[in-house]
Structure formats: C-alpha cells, structure tokens
C-alpha cells in the first residue's frame, strides 16, 4: 500500500495540481482574449477548463490572478542573485527584468499582449497587478539586500525595488496604450535609463 507521504505520490499530486492550474489559466485567458475580461466569469472559466467553479476559486481566490499570476518570481530572484558581484543594482535589475520579459514575449507573445491590453483597459486588472507586484518587490528586495549588505527592510532597498517595478509597469502600460506597436525591449531600456537620469530638461534658447 502506498503511504500518504510517499515521494512518488506527492510528486504525482503536485503535477496534477500544476496541470489543473495551467488549464484554468488557459481557459481564463482564452475567454478574455475572445470576449473581454468581464465575460471571463468563474462559472464560464470552470466550464471551459472542465473543472468545478469551486476548484477555480480554490486555485485562484482572486479572479484576476488567473490572468496575472505565474511562477516567475522565484526564477527572477534566482537570476538576480546570480548576477556578477559588484554590478550596479540598476544594471543587475535591468539585466534580469529585460531577460524575463523578453523570454515571456518570445515564448507566448499573445499572452503578454493580452495581459498588457487588459492592464491598460480594465481597472480591476490593473489594481490587482499592482497588488501582486508587491510580493515580487519583496523577493527582489531580499536579493538586493544580500547583494549590498543591507537589511531587506532597509528603506533604500525597498524604495529602489519598488521604483524599478513601478517603472516597468508604466512601460508596459505605455506600450499597451499605444497599440503594442513599439519595441517593448527598447521601451524597457528607455524606462530604466529614465529612472537613472530623470527626464531630460528642454534645451535653453
């Protein structure tokens, strides 16, 4: 008889959970892409994913997380920790965030475009995105603290991590508001350059 805590059983259970989570995400995004976010109700997503509404709620207590959440935060933190020692914090964050967003764009451009459009057009999605980036900010702050010899709750560390994530959010919104026509990678670099220098002053006559 297989024990409850058998590693094989636990592994199978975890893979099943991951498959269910992925199916719910795909269903929600398909409905949102075709009909808009308001049409992506819990009941409709459940039917599309072939699960019960209670299963959808169990995996995603906040509906917008179906659209917004992924498993990338841990990977992003690991990338930041792997950057060369002594590298400027802004350049470290530039490298890892541009790499992560570029990889997402290459892997599934339509998914990233959908997220960006709904963030720009749907206040509830935009608000939830702001909330979910708080955990990303905490992870990045921990890594920055370790790299700079500061405490994770150091004001400068928290402000810096939050500023970078806020700037990147504005870059994605800017991209979406202009029809997703511009080169996103170039916009990300432009955004982080602006964070370093501020907006250029007008030329004096």
What do these predicted ranges mean?
Residues 1-39, 43-51, 78:
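Basic, helix-initiating cap at the start of DNA-binding domains
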Residues 1-7, 180-205:
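C-terminal peripheral helix-coil segments that are non-catalytic and often amphipathic
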Residues 24, 62-67:
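Short amphipathic alpha-helical segment with a characteristic S/N-K-E followed by hydrophobic residues
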Residues 47, 61-62:
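Residue-level detection of the helix-turn-helix DNA-binding "recognition helix"
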Residues 51-60:
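Short hydrophobic/aromatic patch on the recognition helix
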Residues 74, 110-138:
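Short secondary-structure transition hinges
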Residues 77-115:
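Hydrophobic alpha-helical connector segments
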Residues 130, 146-193:
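Hydrophobic/aromatic-rich alpha-helical bundle segments in the mid-to-C-terminal region
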């Amino acid at each position: 008889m297989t024990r409850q805590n058998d590693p094989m059983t636990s592994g199978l259970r975890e893979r099943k959970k991951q498959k269910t989570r992925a199916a719910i995400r795909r269903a929600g995004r398909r409905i949102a892409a075709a009909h808009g976010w308001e049409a992506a109700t819990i009941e409709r997503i459940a039917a599309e994913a072939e699960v019960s509404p209670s299963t959808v709620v169990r995996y995603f207590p906040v509906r917008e997380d179906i659209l917004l959440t992924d498993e990338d935060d841990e990977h992003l933190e690991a990338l930041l920790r792997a950057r060369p020692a002594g590298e400027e914090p802004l350049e470290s964050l530039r490298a890892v965030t541009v790499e992560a967003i570029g990889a997402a764009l290459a892997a599934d451009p339509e998914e990233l475009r959908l997220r960006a459009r709904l963030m720009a057009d749907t206040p509830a999605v935009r608000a939830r995105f702001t909330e979910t980036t708080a955990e990303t900010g905490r992870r990045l702050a921990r890594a920055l603290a370790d790299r700079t010899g500061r405490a994770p709750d150091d004001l400068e560390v928290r402000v810096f991590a939050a500023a970078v994530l806020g700037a990147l959010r504005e870059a994605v919104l800017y991209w979406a508001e202009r029809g997703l026509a511009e080169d996103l990678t170039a916009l990300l670099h432009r955004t982080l350059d602006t964070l370093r220098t501020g907006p250029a002053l007008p030329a004096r006559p």
